[in-house]
């Protein structure tokens, strides 16, 4: 008797089998020819990137820090999705290039042309596989990878005896801008400027540690607040600073007053708490977390960081589309008449194309962060250029 949990999976597999059998025989045959090179490409590129990115680091921790080998294997498995998702676009390029090159070299594509099958029709299975890999890449990148990387970090910290916290962050910085009175040669005037700057060296389980707050919002006076810890008091909607010192500096006369305190309530936004809960690296955020972080930065008046994050958000959507670009380019190159590409040649061509594409993406991303290009165009222009190049190659192959 099958368990209730297995019933949905059986239904899904049955539905996929029926869908597969409904496809034309030619599409099933061409798709089957792509699966072998696709799996080989995923395995090859994942093994290379995983070895360089994490294996050497774990081996060093096993040898020097006494990390148990079983825990190292567990961390390796949790880090695997992050490197697996990087291999999807590269494997798509390699699979389409090798698969169609082999069929072209054995004159099987020539036989299809002889019965009236167009080149565009031949590459449709490759584009379907590329679209499937695009969707899979987005799901991995947004759902699986962030949680897997967090679990890997927690597992490693636990094994090495570090403090484990579900909410944690380092170097939490939040700046708030506003209209404040500024004194100059013409007297006082209202201008938009930095009003408060909040900094905490560490954030653990809702508590900020080694906190410094600078307040420039009061005319003729600057205030600095230093505390060992700070927590958000929900009842008062204020920050509760503990075990610290408050220093007031009068601009005129350079007078300074200082006082120590055990507890001090300061009216400030809870935004630093949200910032502390977010991953510090945009690459480790989900789309929802990145949108929330961008909103916080925009509200804080940090235009440069907000723009950088808007670029990263667009890149989270544009990165999976690389599979479609590489699928179109690879199939267009492989479908050419008498195209013969060995596995080693396909690997080399794939590496060159991948390097060129990522170099172009890096350049456009830098222009977007600087503000030269809009975030949308900085992320999507490489995709549009790649698609245009792939369509040109497909047109050349159709002649």
Spans of features found by a protein language model:
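Short, membrane-interfacial amphipathic segments enriched in basic
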Residues: 3-28, 62-70, 299-303
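Start (N-cap) of specific transmembrane helices in multi-pass transporter permeases
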Residues: 29, 33-37, 121-134
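Long, hydrophobic alpha-helical segments
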Residues: 80-99
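Transmembrane helix boundary and interhelical loop/hinge segments in multi-pass membrane proteins
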Residues: 96-110, 115
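Short helix-to-coil transition segments within interhelical loops
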Residues: 113-118, 371
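Non-transmembrane, extracytosolic/lumenal segments of membrane-associated proteins
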Residues: 130-254
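Extended, hydrophilic extramembrane loops/domains of integral membrane proteins
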Residues: 275-301
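Transmembrane alpha-helical segments that form the functional core of multipass membrane systems
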Residues: 304-397
